[in-house]
Swiss-Prot record:
One Gene Ontology CC term in the entry: nucleus
Entry comment on modification after translation: Phosphorylated by the cyclin-CDK PHO80-PHO85. Phosphorylation mediates the formation of a stable interaction with the cyclin-CDK and is required for function as an active inhibitor of the complex under phosphate starvation conditions.
Gene (name only): PHO81
Biological role: Inhibits the kinase activity of the cyclin-CDKs PHO80-PHO85 and PCL7-PHO85 under low-phosphate conditions.
Gene Ontology molecular function: cyclin-dependent protein serine/threonine kinase inhibitor activity; phosphoric diester hydrolase activity
Region listing for Disordered, in residue ranges: 210-250
One GO BP: lipid metabolic process
Domain SPX: 1-169
ANK repeats: 423-452, 458-487, 506-535, 556-586, 591-620, 624-653
Subcellular location field: Cytoplasm; Nucleus
Full protein name: Phosphate system positive regulatory protein PHO81
Amino acid sequence: MKFGKYLEARQLELAEYNSHFIDYKALKKLIKQLAIPTLKASSDLDLHLTLDDIDEKIIHQRLQENKAAFFFKLERELEKVNGYYLARESDLRIKFNILHSKYKDYKINGKLNSNQATSFKNLYAAFKKFQKDLRNLEQYVELNKTGFSKALKKWDKRSQSHDKDFYLATVVSIQPIFTRDGPLKLNDETLHILLELNDIDNNNRRADIQSSTFTNDDDDDNNTSNNNKHNNNNNNNNNNNNNNNNNNILHNNYELTTSKISENQLEHLFQASSSSLDMEMEIENWYKEILNIATVKDVQRKHALLRNFRETKIFTYLLQNSSESFHKNVFSLLKECLTTLFLLLVASPLDDNSLHIFYKSNQDHIDLSYCDEDDQVFSRKNVFHEAASCPEKSRLFILDEALTTSKLSKETVQKLLNAQDIHSRVPLHYAAELGKLEFVHSLLITNLLEDVDPIDSDSKTPLVLAITNNHIDVVRDLLTIGGANASPIEKPILDYSKNVISSTKVQFDPLNVACKFNNHDAAKLLLEIRSKQNADNAKNKSSQHLCQPLFKKNSTGLCTLHIVAKIGGDPQLIQLLIRYGADPNEIDGFNKWTPIFYAVRSGHSEVITELLKHNARLDIEDDNGHSPLFYALWESHVDVLNALLQRPLNLPSAPLNEINSQSSTQRLNTIDLTPNDDKFDLDIQDSIPDFALPPPIIPLRKYGHNFLEKKIFIKLKLRPGLESIKLTQDNGIIMSSSPGRITLSSNLPEIIPRNVILPVRSGEINNFCKDISETNDEEDDDEISEDHDDGEIIFQVDSIDDFSMDFEIFPSFGTRIIAKTTAMPFLFKKVAINSIATMNLPLFDTRLNNIGSLTLDYQIIFPYPGNPLKIINYEPYWKSTGSDLMTSSKDGNFVTSSSLNGSFISVLVCALNDETIVAAPKPYVEFKGTKILLNDLTKEQLEKVVDYDFGKIDGSFDEVTLKQYLSSRVVPLRSLLEVIPGSAQLVIRVYFPTDKEIDTIPIKISPFININQFIDKLLLIIFEHERFLRHSGSGSMRQIVFSSCNWEACSILNWKQPNFPVLLQMKNLLRDSTTGKFVGDTPNCLKELAVNPQKMSYLNTELINIHTMVQFAMNNNLLGVTLPYEVLKICPSLARIIKQNGLLLIASVGENDQIPADGGYSGIYYACELLFENNIDM
């Protein structure tokens, strides 16, 4: 992603840091301005001067002359971010000190003994929010660090200087923002407190479990029968009446009773110690009692209990436990208790009717404007925040009561309704987010809201939240009744220190949000309102009522159709947007793509079909020279490919930058240096290459590939994102510390510890297909580097008997460990059919509490156990060539030569159920119309099925007769090699089913067979045969090429030996001759053998994955890949890209097809024969 766009997008997520980031865009424009010679206004020629008219030397000279101006601006930006960082760090330190003091106070006073206590919940939520603030500060630091580095890099390239490294080392890196470790310490201390809270939580849970045995007996007694229930209720009522007989009048008429209390009684109450009053815990108990009362089925009794709760519970408690200040503050104390209790109940699942009865019976003693002192630290929510954010109940009556019967003034209610909580949200935010239509409607018609579009800390307005959650009725009310802005303009931010507008506050565009969440109704409503507003403004013709565009680009430069195409939106939404004027061929501001590119890469065939109906163009190429069809083959699936093939592809391709060329040409023909101009950039003319060493004198691929001689290959693979780490769902405290990296360390001293940055990068290779020669230097400069790893960690060890691996998980920000686990040696000894297995390891925190699990895949490849062919004695597939070939070609590829040439006869090999390795025309045999897989049969069973002695081979063969023989007979591979002429070259096609084929076909594999053992036996036969040829006097090796559709088989073959090359073959994409459409198959073309064909439906939506195939071949040092000619024919650029990455490309041609004349392929696979060209260049 381009850094400028990335930085702009991040400002939406870090709204509180908006306008305080490095002004990267302004620095780029300054470089551009400083590079332009001073223009004379009187010269018409100068006014229309283009970049092509400016000599490059003049640009460099101008930048050197204005060097002081650029670095002056850069230093001001450094002062800005540094000053804001110091202020922000100071604020966070103060906030932590307050929270820490609260934590210590609560802990001493026993307020954290229960995880259900309000103090516990508030403290946990506050520390969780504080952790988020720390993470945001760290991201702010990293983004600015990257910004300064890239701005200096751009300066060096434009001015041809070398100031970047020196300035970063001597000026930027020594600033407090990049050197202080205060936030790291705060994060560690915060995590320590959260772990202690977690211990309290776990201890309480254990106590609850231990006490449950006692409560279960009571519950059984209370639920024996209906008669017993009735008797028990009567007995309980009688007992209550007896116990409270002397106090009924007092409870029902507490004001009168209080006035009649004698002075002796008051003196007795004054003697009670104030320290014994723990009002908070008692309020918690009252809270639970009211929730239990709400479950009573007798409605009249429930209502009576709620109405009398104040007298029967609260007032009695105050009489028995009040302090000396009771006589003076009894009413204020009672009011505080009832108000606090009511606020708790507002946020509870208590039904509205019960809560309303409780409120009406205590209305005179509940202050709706009350706000606890602790809440100013924790949440800053008032009663309207709590009512609006209650997810299960309406709570509308609270707003009605505040507006009608309460004693609150209108000004107070207005202040409460517009008050912001700790997340900068007003009650309208929560009501809109939860879809509380009546609550939103009541808020809007009060006319007390100062702003209907307030922006919270996540840059979201109530309208955006309603659209996100698909509350269309709320959206309609906000737009029509509240007058929410359907087309908001970024709000200016005033710099009070300078009394100027420093920047604008970035916010989400509602229509783009509706498109992102596939909200057709909201998009329709927004477009209708925007169109009407533009029509009214057009009639007005006033400068104050300018028409706003219907469609706006989001922070990453995507337009509405691009967003819909990327997420796979509803075709009706596409129709709606196009009906209102959206262009299906519009180019976005990020990748310079049209919407169909995004639909292809995201795999949305229905979107592609809809776009094609509206004349979306396919005869276009992006800046890298790739068409939508290329990306469909490169990283999409079969349905997408077939959707694109509905349109004829014989039209000449046009670059995307030629679309709407007239308007773009006009923009580029004049020099426009206004602050808002983003189209004109000197980067287009930049051709200065990155500093790079020349290619080595002897290319690495000249000497074949690495192989395992005695070491064991172990590869650990973490899953994309954070899928490998599963934290316990009910352990919210630990989950609040997001994993940021995993450290792997082994017990073996020779293995260096590794760090994996999280989240793990997905398998997509976004820029892998970019031409080396066409890579724009400016694009590299603008791209934000991804620090995340691909999750693969490789080790080579002598033995797995004593190999273990420790995994330590750390937060993304901080040094305190979150969790740890260990993989013991026995886990790596599990025999895997395809060499790949999965392990699940329990995760433990520092107190050895299990908090989740770590899931990862691992692959183990053992070295060849026998005597390999020594390279010094047996010529490998590569050979030394003259120095004239050891150069870099003009397209950036290393040119090497291979000894492979001529014709190679194809031999398919597989293992029987008894481990016998045979050569066969297909991986199955037909018996009375039934296809039986060879791996299901033993040698004896196979002979009975084929009805001949397959171990006996009569006569000798030449190339022609050998092909005919292999097309109809199943023979042991060892016997076959003995009778084949030594001059015959072979391509050994290794058949071994993949894990998915084993599961979906399904295929039964003998427990005595796995891919490691199978390849060991295969290599043993090949090596013995080669030695036999050498000792028989032939003096040379038989030329052999290994090929397989099983990716793991190719990898293992390449790691076990260096003598023979390995090709990875694709056979899972076929073209139906009747329909002309492509169909998916399994890697070994076994779909027709599936027991349940419905299980194979995934093949049409499974990724074609040519890009992953190419990347796998490169990572495992394979010689090349084999692709169907039908695929290469429809997209010739695939061949160029694959060959530019140093791989041989073999075109696989069907038996009924003609051999292509000259498609630039390294070889042709045709009719069970592999034909290599002479002098193959790689």
